[in-house]
């Protein structure tokens, strides 16, 4: 079946051999634009509601660099580093909702389009809006090159089964245990229904 708005899908962009996981926000025929960081579908801004900021551990996969996340690193008393991220709950026209990260009010993808999604194509965006290689960007800017054809979408991503912090060695499976991000394992990727 065709993806629906809010689905998280696995895809390989045309002409590339790297898999991506992104969220479907635009369907064939939809007019998509982004203004001031707000996603607009068919002329209607998507509902956005700020949530409590979230602390995530700084690790090799989520380094929380000062360039990308100015003033967001926090050192706890035990010496551990954390990144404090603003979370925005978006609710799509079909009532499905999910959380996004939106740190920079003026990032390159915060103003885009409008574009009409072609037949049998889907407009995809990442939930980390300021740092996502998605349909807003051409491939030479590490994006998906626009809306993605149906045949390049492999299927839905349902859950995170295994998540490592980047400190493990491919050749040392024992290191996978210390690098496991247990809080992410077996969490759903699907949006909440309205």
Residue ranges of predicted features:
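Soluble "head" domains of membrane/secretory-pathway proteins
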Residues: 1-194
